Amino acid sequence: MKRVWLWGAVLGASALLNGCTSDTDNDGGTPPPAHQEGYADPDGVILLNQGARMSENGSISYLAPDGSIEKDVYRTVNGSAFGNEAMDLDMCNGKIYIMSNNLYRPNNEAGDGCLVVADAETFRREKVFTADDLTFPRPEGSLEEQEMLPLLTPLENIAVMDEHNIFFSDSQGLFRLDGTTGELNIVKGSYAFGNQGATIETVVSTRGMTVIGDHLYCAGGGFWSETKLFEFTRGSDEVTRELPLKGEFISGICRTGDHELLVATCGRSGSTKSYLTYVDTDSWSITLERPLNADISAEFMNSSGVTLAGDYLYFAAGSLTVSRLSLKTWEVEEYIHVTDDAPEARYLTCNVVADPERQLLYVSVSNELGEAIVSDGNILVYDCSGEEPVLKNNLVNRGSYPVNIYPVSRFYR
């Protein structure tokens, strides 16, 4: 799906397959109980609706464990919109962090901010950062004149270790925000000097960035840089370790163990020259590398191009056909033809998302696509535990251009 009003020519970004560390030996506050209630129930699902930015603000839909769905959760609780053109969210230590570009005021309604922090159980707003709040010191080597530089939209992805270590990205690079002081710094080595922050491909891509303990992992690559896996550390504004990878672009990252990642890389859109690489994060070594003759591109979407459930890796490469790869036999098969269940669908709004705990697959589609068009759409929920997919739920017009879907259980890993 070519979402030109969102991305322009930028190809960086990520669905979030990350868990928040439970380490309490920091000033990030006391973590809540392992499992929470309300909207933080691990059996629930959060839908982040980007919305048609010229006609509506972003919103939250919540799919409850009993299968019922609640629309516009944040507005119901707070009486306002969290932001315009929602991009990503994360949950950590009982807080929800919602990120938006927040450039437009549809129907003359301003969103609360670019980054909104809310209570995870209630969605009650607690803290807001506007674009004016989020400026960072000019990096060494930059040709910009001003000492403090603004973020560039689109914003991309967010991963939170604690309130002192909020990592997020835009097309310039990766940033670390201390949510208690508002201090924002760009991570050294991630700034795109190639074209002063307006590169065709960002050096560090945060699509699929993953937190394990005190470390954050994301990959990078593109036209001007070698493809690598990067490690960042709590409290640090520098890259800790780098590991070279095969492939040109980043599709996504899946966490496959306590200290193991599966990194998916690919060629240009439409290319079937892809790679899957297993990495041991303790030894910082590649344990398995397999070429894959399939298009696993994440396209222009802000979520991971691959998603894992059981022994299968699922992907759609921006199409309305969901394929899966067996990690046992390494065979690829077409698994779901979306138009069989949503005949009017024409566009994927985000990459497919799996819930590995319940063996469910979420596919979000729309009938139209436009920054001012509020389109009909479907969120299809499939049981993928068997050889054939089983449609469990078809949610019609319960979201608006969902930019990502978050089974809440992923935040408790």
Regions from the language model: what does each represent?
Residues A64-G67, D119-F123, D178-G182, F232-D237, ...:
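Short loop/turn segments that connect beta-strands within beta-propeller blades
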Residues P32-H35, A81-M91, T135-M161, N195-T210, ...:
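Repeated scaffold domains used in trafficking and secretory/extracellular systems
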Residues Q50-E156, M161-E163:
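Post-signal peptide N-terminal segment of secreted/secretory-pathway proteins
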Residues T180-L320:
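Acidic, serine/threonine- and glycine-rich low-complexity intrinsically disordered segments
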Residues I69-A81, R124-L149, E183-I200, D237-P244, ...:
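A short beta-strand motif characteristic of beta-propeller blades
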Residues V374-R413:
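Blade-level signature of beta-propeller repeat domains, shared across WD40, Kelch, NHL, RCC1
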Residues M1-V45, S236:
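Bacterial Sec-dependent N-terminal signal peptides
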Residues M54-S61, P106-V116, G173-D178, W224-E231, ...:
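Structural motif
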